[in-house]
Amino acid sequence: MTRSANSPFEVAIVGGGITGLALAVGLLKRNVSFTIYERAENFGELGVGITFTPNAQRAMEALDPCVLQSFTNVASAPSGGTINFVDGVREQGSEDPRTSTAALLFQLHVKGGYKACRRCDFVDQIVQHIPKDCVQYRKWLDSIETDHESGRAVLKFRDGEIAHADVVIGCDGIRSQVRASMFGTDELCPRAQYSHQLGYRGMVPLAQATAVLGPEKTSSAVLHTGPGAFVLTIPLAEVHAMHIEAFIMDKEEWPEVQTSSDSKRYVLPATRNEATKAFAEFGPTVRSAVSMFPEKLEKWAVFDMLEAPVPTFAKGRVCLAGDAAHASTPNQGGGAGFGIEDALVLAEVLAVLAEAPNVSGIVASEALAVYSEVRYERSQWLVRSSRRTGELCTWKDRDWGLAAEELSRDIISRSHQLWDHDTAGMVSDALAILGERVRGADTAF
């Protein structure tokens, strides 16, 4: 079946997280019609920190310079463009973190910039570029079917409403309903699973952090490694705050949380005392950093798709992007950025489809298959590598505090594989493959 030449090519974006919003701006730039279907009442994001590495920033600019500008408006870069990896257990000097010294294992130099911001600030910036009439809120997807007359996708929502689209892009996160519609929901189907890593996250005033830890330890990003856990502190000068992430490797299973809110399934109440006990064997800097958490806080389960990946990101007129496609642990700071890379390839591929007078189901399927082909292996690498980086930072194999050179080589190599990706080449490859595939797939294209 083929779309009528008089009907505009329409993209349905399910999910209004960062990947979905970035894709929307990229489509807008390329004059591709779209609608975002967001289950929440607004685009509100948590006020926790998020990082974007150089590859992600290049993809932002290629999507639309306003995406990169939205980020840089609210982002901070670590002093000197480095992340200091230190031994978080053994410190020299006193028990006062302002005067104690942690052994520097190595410095990770981020060429081109490693920047962080609060999620909510970035979202507030980027939504300003999306027309309000392109968004529908409180739309909880129930199923995706095919209109047998037109061949287009039919989205059915829990409120009884339906929508039609030429292609559907699932940007609906780790518990993706789009993914479920593609592959099913039983235990053998692709899905995100508990990685046995949990985290405590918080933002504290930078002045408070400086008073507790000292100016030297709050002027740059520091990753404190240690047995079974690690802590990352990132100063965000533009918002006068320090973002603290404390991660623990957990042997238990994550309990099933019954809630209508998808994000709350991965959150449990916790206390500062619980967090401080987990880091009791660490040095004074880590213990003091964790002590700045509020008395009542939350602990977050880290889910990824290492054990149950999707076999492909595309199936017919439907595909996945971001966490819905390749949820990963946050240990390399690359997950959100890979969603931006996904959005760039999709925006370019969909722009080609939108320019065609007619788009059949065959051509739409081929185009989305090209996106999957270009993005799949790199994304699966990140899932594996990010999990391994967490093992390195928590000394799973050995006391890396005593083998800094070997640790340095491993993490630096992984980091450059993440950062140095040829973004322009990725897009060129996708368009070249698309041209070859569709040339013989449909003469109406």
UniProtKB/Swiss-Prot annotation:
<dbReference type="InterPro" id="IPR002938">
    <property type="entry name" value="FAD-bd"/>
</dbReference>
<feature type="binding site">
    <location>
        <position position="119"/>
    </location>
    <ligand>
        <name>FAD</name>
    </ligand>
</feature>
<keyword id="KW-0560">Oxidoreductase</keyword>
<dbReference type="GO" id="GO:0004497">
    <property type="term" value="F:monooxygenase activity"/>
</dbReference>
<keyword id="KW-0325">Glycoprotein</keyword>
<feature type="binding site">
    <location>
        <position position="336"/>
    </location>
    <ligand>
        <name>FAD</name>
    </ligand>
</feature>
<keyword id="KW-0472">Membrane</keyword>
<feature type="binding site">
    <location>
        <position position="38"/>
    </location>
    <ligand>
        <name>FAD</name>
    </ligand>
</feature>
<keyword id="KW-0812">Transmembrane</keyword>
<keyword id="KW-0274">FAD</keyword>
<dbReference type="Pfam" id="PF01494">
    <property type="entry name" value="FAD_binding_3"/>
</dbReference>
<keyword id="KW-0503">Monooxygenase</keyword>
<dbReference type="GO" id="GO:0044550">
    <property type="term" value="P:secondary metabolite biosynthetic process"/>
</dbReference>
<feature type="binding site">
    <location>
        <position position="323"/>
    </location>
    <ligand>
        <name>FAD</name>
    </ligand>
</feature>
<feature type="glycosylation site" description="N-linked (GlcNAc...) asparagine">
    <location>
        <position position="31"/>
    </location>
</feature>
<feature type="glycosylation site" description="N-linked (GlcNAc...) asparagine">
    <location>
        <position position="358"/>
    </location>
</feature>
<dbReference type="InterPro" id="IPR036188">
    <property type="entry name" value="FAD/NAD-bd_sf"/>
</dbReference>
<feature type="transmembrane region" description="Helical">
    <location>
        <begin position="8"/>
        <end position="28"/>
    </location>
</feature>
<comment type="similarity">
    <text>Belongs to the paxM FAD-dependent monooxygenase family.</text>
</comment>
<dbReference type="GO" id="GO:0016020">
    <property type="term" value="C:membrane"/>
</dbReference>
<protein>
    <recommendedName>
        <fullName>FAD-dependent monooxygenase sorC</fullName>
        <ecNumber>1.-.-.-</ecNumber>
    </recommendedName>
</protein>
<comment type="function">
    <text>FAD-dependent monooxygenase; part of the gene cluster that mediates the biosynthesis of sorbicillinoids, a diverse group of yellow secondary metabolites that restrict growth of competing pathogenic fungi but not of bacteria. Sorbicillinoids biosynthesis requires the action of two PKSs. SorA iteratively combines three acetyl units and the growing chain is modified by the ketoacyl reductase subunit, and optional by the enoyl reductase subunit in the second cycle. The polyketide is then handed over to the PKS SorB, which adds three more acetyl units, and two methyl groups.</text>
</comment>
<dbReference type="GO" id="GO:0071949">
    <property type="term" value="F:FAD binding"/>
</dbReference>
<keyword id="KW-0285">Flavoprotein</keyword>
<comment type="pathway">
    <text>Secondary metabolite biosynthesis.</text>
</comment>
<dbReference type="InterPro" id="IPR051104">
    <property type="entry name" value="FAD_monoxygenase"/>
</dbReference>
<feature type="active site">
    <location>
        <position position="201"/>
    </location>
</feature>
<keyword id="KW-1133">Transmembrane helix</keyword>
